[in-house]
Amino acid sequence: LQLAFISVISSLAGGSLIGIFSLSAIKPVRWLARAYVDFSRGTPLLVQIFMIYFGLPAFFQELGFSFLLNRLLAGVITFSLNSTAYIAGIVRAGIQSIEVGQSEAARSLGLNSLQTMRHLIFPQALRRMIPPLGNEFISLLKDTSLVAVIGFAELFRKGQLIVAENYRAFEIYAAVAVIYLCLTLVCSQAISRLEKWMKWRGV
């Protein structure tokens, strides 16, 4: 849970920026943002974990710098970068769902592009983004099981360690699956309540 929450908070900020950059009128900015999204979404998450945990220290070692990433930090970096790409797509779609006429009306009132995005477009788009953002968080929560491959002691890894001690694989992995199911159901309910609250408040 710690890994998922830290990653989703950082990826919300990064994904919002990349999503806005992917709609930029400046071509190099738009191309870079979309290239980042394509790379992150087009490569396996497991490969990205190995790139960060094993590849990044090796790369810097070639440059003469020696350091090691701890497992939690490697997981946070990987999941944040990966989730940022998916959230960027959600943000981009949310912004594009707002009628173009609203931006034109804002400009006629003297608002610049930044003010229009901050005060008019993004608040409206945010409400439409809540369901897909919730789905992304749930996917991220389940994907954290992958960091077991680098030995990080999250839920799935702890299940593996217990199985290694008592060899009751079916019961242990079934219990792990039920815990993941409970976590995702709780998250789904929380997201649903947030969506209803935003509608009630007229956000």
Can you name each region flagged by the protein language model?
Residues 1-203:
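Transmembrane alpha-helices and adjacent helix-loop boundaries
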